[in-house]
């Protein structure tokens, strides 16, 4: 579950964020919790820990990395910086902005960008000198501590389009297909994106107690579990905690809309 909060956003960007959340929750096991009203820290045994929130903010200066520079819920607050240019409904559709945010949320959920795969040079050409200096981290090849599933995915929402992160996005490419073909913006989660996220997440419903409650749709190995399979999995997880039966409804946390 991703603890998601937001700073001041226009209705257009906020709507895109809500759209991104709904799209990911409908197609993957990832669930989001609105942590906007929660404390940022928790104290355990005298030690204060900053909670791993993901916060969506508008970019205010060029030193802030577009999207997120962090991969995985590594502790502390992670910021998703939305470029000011995206706050233009005459230039971008809300779906395009939602795709930008889904990409960032996939990074926060633990996915590296597709162009960071160690085998990327077999499929794409990177033009390093054309990339904004603050965004080069989005192209750093991962050679260790990295899970790579399947073949290189040209449809992944995490794959940069040809002019993404460019010092001159109207004319200069940062990445092309091997051989020079352009890479279009991917606006939806690919099959491989969904498979990866579903491998590492379960669709937990937020609760105030120790019960585990799974949402009505659970994906496993590319398939949706039947209701009986979902309940069996939920029962098994609760039995590991010494809890038996159906999680009581009064323990659920009602998710508030982001505003």
Label each region the model flagged:
Residues 1-259:
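Zinc-dependent metalloendopeptidases
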């Amino acid at each position: 579950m991703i603890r998601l909060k937001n700073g001041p956003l226009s209705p257009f960007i906020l709507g895109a964020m809500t759209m991104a959340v709904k799209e990911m929750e409908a197609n993957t096991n990832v669930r989001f919790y609105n942590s906007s009203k929660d404390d940022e820290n928790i104290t355990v045994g005298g030690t204060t820990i900053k909670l791993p929130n993901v916060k969506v903010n508008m970019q205010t200066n060029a030193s802030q990395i577009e999207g997120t520079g962090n991969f995985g819920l590594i502790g502390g607050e992670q910021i998703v910086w939305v470029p000011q240019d995206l706050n233009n409904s005459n230039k971008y559709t809300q779906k395009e902005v939602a795709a930008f945010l889904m990409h960032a949320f996939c990074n926060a959920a633990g996915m590296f960008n597709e162009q960071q795969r160690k085998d990327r040079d077999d499929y794409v050409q990177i033009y390093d000198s054309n990339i904004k200096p603050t965004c080069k981290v989005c192209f750093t090849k991962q050679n260790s501590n990295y899970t790579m599933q399947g073949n290189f995915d040209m449809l992944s929402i995490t794959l940069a389009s040809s002019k993404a992160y460019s010092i001159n996005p109207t004319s200069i490419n940062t990445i092309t297909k091997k051989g020079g073909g352009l890479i279009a913006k991917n606006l939806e989660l690919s099959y491989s994106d969904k498979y990866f996220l579903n491998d590492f997440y379960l669709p937990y419903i937020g609760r105030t107690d120790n019960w585990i409650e799974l949402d009505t749709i659970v994906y496993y190995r590319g398939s949706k579990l039947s209701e009986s399979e979902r309940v069996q999995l939920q029962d098994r997880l609760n039995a590991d905690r010494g809890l038996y039966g159906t999680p009581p409804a009064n323990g659920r946390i009602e998710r508030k809309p982001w505003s």
